[in-house]
Amino acid sequence: ENRNFRECFALQRAIRHNGANAEVWGLNHDNYSEEPDWQSYDLIINLENYDETGWVPSLSKVQTKKFLWSIDAHCRGIDVYTQTANEGNYDLILEATPEFLTENSIWFPNCYEDVLIKPLDIDPIHDVGFCGNVVNRGQILQTVAQNFNFKFDNFVIGDAMVEAVNSYKIHFNANISLDINYGNFETMGCETLLLTSYNKHYEKLGLKDGENCLVYSSIEELIEKGNMALGDKELRNRIAKNGYDIVKEKHTFKQRAKTVLDILNGIYDEQSI
């Protein structure tokens, strides 16, 4: 139910959308039994963030350009990614968390798959919802539930996730640690109003409090802004539409794939993010 939403297939579709070809290979894929001819590619992108069995082959002697996509350094720390990059002689780390940038990495923010995640023709029936994993959000989710008509969709994935987010007037989000998680972009990609915890890098991504999302820095602010948006449908819809427009323009897998191809072709502009 979540297969088509995985990063590997989302990036593959996006690369093809940008006019290049892409193949997916790895553990639990149908083609895993036959290792590719790595030298036959222009670029290899390693998306594995949790190689617990050591299945990823050593690419240290492969001369093809190699990128490592670091998505979860905010959870695991940067050392494991740096070690993988060094041992495999990777050319570049695509780093989702800007606090971990080095001279061998670029900021590669999270994004969303606009082919699968989009506004649906349904009326939102829940004032505030949360679709995702609890992790360390238990206490704040309890607070939200105590203050709003709240719908909790625990680990709902795939098409059901898209339907859930579309059913909320407001989608509550709490980033973990330094992360700007996928949920930010997925929510806005559904044209649902995002109410999210503060991150200092939002402005660089074009996410602006009160214009295309709502950002809180305290419980009091969370409740105040949630009630404000619920009490003003026109405001809520306007902010949600602005949010949809900004992520559709700047933060889809298609844009991230273009960045990868621009780097490969030597025409990357850091200001494009």
Across the structure, where does each feature detected by a protein language model lie?
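N-terminal soluble segments of membrane proteins
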Residues: D209, G226-N227
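Nucleotide-sugar donor-binding catalytic core of glycosyltransferases
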Residues: E1-D209, V215, K254, K258, ...
